[in-house]
């Protein structure tokens, strides 16, 4: 017995082979018992090594049916014509106990094609096109369908335009992206850029974004709302003056003056607010910090 795994193209496992052998042994044991009972009690003339077909033939002969060598089965005295003997029944047999009807679709020729109609250039017309449509159609409006022009459907349409096409010799020009005109026009670039205190001013050519911004996240976010008065060359990172004391000191003086007025308050949207702990990063002077690069303090 061939299992589904072997039919799929893969080798069955040892467990599947054992199950197949077990089922085959069980089937043969049951068939042997049936054959033994038919020979002993039913007076059936069955050969020693027979299969299920021999049993079916014997049962049909006992019921009054005739089974020929090629498998054609019919009642005695009601032999079918030779044309339909090997195929399916096309009508009702007056001698059969069960009336076998043909398919309903075979009684009326269908005027509607079940596939695309043949093109006009084809040498074999579509078999579903009827010259004289029958008046016994199920639906009246289907009578005019055979008179419709054939469908011109092609599944091999060219992907590229032909040489005669006006666009074949002149391919469309690809527009060059204007990355250098206004980088903040593109939303994905603006999202990826870090926030800076000078972001509120829309310049024609904005400052270059530093590659490594080591500022704190809260400081960067708070810089969006604080109104800093800085020069056009102000650095974008709040910690820039800590590593470069020689930079412009105008922005540090502005921030220190703002922090000096009113203690720990700063301007927020034209008002005075008190910052929380973590925002006071500009109170540390540059001379109070000692930067060492891999050298321990002596």
Swiss-Prot record:
Region of interest (PEST-like), residue spans: 204-224
UniProt source species: Oryza sativa subsp. japonica
Main localisation: nucleus
Miscellaneous notes: Plants silencing BZR1 are dwarf with erect leaves, and have reduced brassinosteroid sensitivity and altered expression of brassinosteroid-responsive genes.
A Pfam family this chain is assigned to: BES1_N
Span list, region Disordered: 1-25, 71-129, 153-175, 190-217
InterPro entries from the UniProt entry: BES1_N, BZR
Effect on the protein upon substituting residue 206 to L: Increases lamina joint bending
Protein's recorded name: Protein BZR1 homolog 1
Biased composition (Low complexity): 96-128
Gene that this polypeptide is encoded by: BZR1
Residues recorded as bearing Phosphoserine in the entry: 156
